[in-house]
Structures are given as structure tokens and as C-alpha cells.
Amino acid sequence: MFNIPFFQRTPETFGLDIGSSAVKVVQFRPAASGPGLVALGIAPVAPDVVAEGTIKDPPSLAEAIKQAIGRAGVKTKEAAIGVSGRELIIKKVQIPEVPAKELRDAVQLEAEHHIPFAIDEVFLDYHVVSRRDGAMELIVVAVKKSKVVEYVGVVEEAGLNPVVVDVDGFALGNQFELNHPDQADEAVALIDIGASVMKTNVMRAGASIFARDIPFGGNNYTQAITQHLKIPAEQAEAAKLGQDVGVTWDALVPALETVSRELSLEVQRTFDYFASTADSERIGKIVLAGGCSQLPGLADYLSSTWGIPVELARPFERIEVPPAHAEAVAAAGPALAVAVGLALRQPGDKAE
């Protein structure tokens, strides 16, 4: 959805998902039967290099990007990247219906009432949700120019050319739209649980109708385990991932359950806000993505708490995966949803 207007089109874009715990690279080849995976690489990001979407250590992040690119074997330089976090504002607004040629100016005027930054300090984009009764409902997206410059700078430092800047939550929607082209006319909440940020995107009939980032994620689980068991953060993270580091799963359960309750409450607040803006529309299903989505028991717990189906994202459902990448895709699966959504982008493809 989000586009920087001054980059030019290229036919060989790849997805570069820059997270606070890992960098993920995905590239497809186009085909009449659908995209096929040609490159996949993941590299870890050290703690505190990226925090809640803010880059704290650009040189270290650039090295992680280079490592992921090397593991993927990507030969092109043109990347589609995503942003998330505190300097990203996503608002659902309503304005009187205006002619198409006047819409961007009208959105800018309305955005000034909803964005806590000076309008000349942000890149602004929008998506029309609906038109009815002489009014237009839109999702307005603003991200501080300084944040985009920060991300573009570190990507360029890694030797790449960022040609698309999207929003992580909307990239999540890109892959869902590809993999579920016959989505029923019900609201589906996509939730990507990253290390420090949860990205939510509510979709209906192939379009985003609500989106929000929540500063909560897998690091909350790691911190709770560290405090509960009095063990180092590195050991707690490994135990959370199911690695054999001398900690039984039963020992983790009290800490995990506490954080899962907190996660549920955070998301419920977002759902309540969505309901207040959506004319009593209700969410019919939840799809979890991100590295923390595969935490044993989490989907079942959330389903029982909210009383609606919860399932894991299948970002490669309609993508041809060669045998060489099958094991990595099976292992990472939902964690690659944003990278897949970014890999589907091309400059100019989302212009209104």
C-alpha cells in the first residue's frame, strides 16, 4: 500500500523483512501458474539492534542484511522493505466524497487532524475502504520521513536499492490475499507477532479495513521466562524456541500463560477499537503469523479466549516451493508471512 514515489520500476524486486530478531529475504519468479520461490535466507539480528521498529545500531543491522542476502543467494539489488513501530501512524477516517483528482489534497487536510507530527515531516498514503451516502471511508497511513530515511540508509549501506517501502501489516495482507483469493465476506484479523511489535491487519473481501501496530511481542515471553526462572535472556529465548538448554517445558508454562493473557488483552483492546469504528462489524477468524505464532498452545488458547477460530498463516499455500527450500519453509512458515508479502510487491503496483 505504502509507496515512496521517487523510485523507478524494476522487474526483479525481492522482499526484505527487517525485524528486531531476524532479517528475512524472499524472492519469487513470476509465472502464469503463480509465483515460485527462488531465494530464501534468514539471518539473526542481535538484541537491541532494532527495538520496536527503531534502528539502534545501523552498522550491525547492515551486516545482518548482508548475511541474509548471502544465505539467500539473491543476485539483484532491488528490495521491497517494510516499516512498523511508533513513528508509523495508521488511522481510519471518514471524509465527504470528493472527485478523484481532489482526493489526495482532501486526505492531506484531514490527516492533519489525526497525525501527531507536522504534515511536512511525514510520507502520507491512503486506501479507500468504502463509499456510501456521500461519504468516503479511508485508511490513512503516515510515517515520519526520518524513519524512512533511516531504513533506506541502512539498506543502502548493505549495498541494496530499496525500491518499495510498504507497511509490515499491509505486507501481511498481500500474502493473505494471494493465498486466499476466495476469502468469504467476513472480517479476518491477521496478527503478526514479532519480537517487539504485533502488526494487525483486518481484511474483508481482499481489502484492508483496519490496521494497527501494538508494541508487544515475543520478547515479552523471553523477559517473563528470564524473571520467572532467574536465567539469562539467551537461555530463556532458546527455551522458548523449544531448544534443549536444561529447562523443561513445564517450568516455562507459568510465565508463558501470564504473557499469553497479556497478549490476549492487548489484542482485545484493538478489536474493541475496531468494532467501535466498523458499524458493529465483528471479526470471524484470526490468522497468526510471525516467529512467536508457533508457540505451542497459543492458537488454541486465543481461540478459546475469544470464541472464534484461530489458525496459523500459510504464506506459501499458493507458491511453488522447490525441494531445496521445502525444509526451511516448513520450519519457518508463518514467520515468513511479511517477507512473502513484501516479495509480492513492485514499485507503483499499489498506486490509487
Which residues does each PLM region occupy?
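Hydrophobic/aromatic-enriched cytosolic interaction surfaces used to assemble or bind macromolecules
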Residues: 1-352
